[in-house]
Amino acid sequence: SYICNMAHLNDFMTRIDFSVLNDYVAAKGKSILYARGERLVQQGNLCRYVGIVKSGYFKYVALNSKGDEVVTGFSFEGEVVTDYVQGFLYNRPSLTSIVAGSDAEVQRVLIEEARRFIVERTPGFVAEVSSNLLEEAYSRYLNMLVKTPTERFRELVSRYPGVIHNLPIHEIASYLGISRRQLHRIRGAENAAATSAERLGEVPF
């Protein structure tokens, strides 16, 4: 399975009990296969579905002023995939596209049906997820402002070591807000430093 053993890149996923949504999707959902590059929702359209990723992964991308895709987030195996803010909360057109980063399978339901069920069953769920999403967005915003690209890379690798081996380099670079060339330089410097440290450790004192 794809990235099934990787720690959650989305911190809020570990702080919220998604069991009600998971159970509803498992009972009512339909299994849909997405080919790599296929979209769950296109930027500018309404997101119609909420689902659980059964295999593969999805990336959230938005177009910048140059028309280039910028990766803003991911949903991995076992995680919820949807446009929570624009789609689930406000029923507005999505500000991002949700794209299959690999061949993927999703158990999905209509977003309005899931919203109605969850609000009736767990009234505090919407507020809890919204609060955690805001906290995560604010934390990432501060990181982009105050930390260097190397510091952001080190933090990412330290917290989620599997990400480097399981995601394309250009997607990681985009998520970190740096160019592929910058990321290659950072990785090269980090690998060189690690090799040097290992050699020093082998020298007898």
Predicted region positions:
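A generic structural motif
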Residues: V61-L63, V99
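Short phosphate-coordinating micro-motif centered on Lys-Gly-acidic
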Residues: L40-N45
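Cyclic-nucleotide recognition modules
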Residues: V71-V129
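Short, Lys/Arg-enriched N-terminal segment that forms or immediately precedes the first helix
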Residues: N132-N143
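Glycine- and acidic-residue-biased ligand/ion/polar-headgroup-sensing regions
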Residues: R48, I52-V61, G78
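Phosphate-/nucleic-acid-contacting segments
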Residues: K147-F205
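Cyclic nucleotide-binding regulatory module and flanking cytosolic helices
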Residues: Y2-S31, Q86
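A cytosolic small-molecule/anion-sensing beta-strand core signal
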Residues: A35, K54-S55, F76, S102
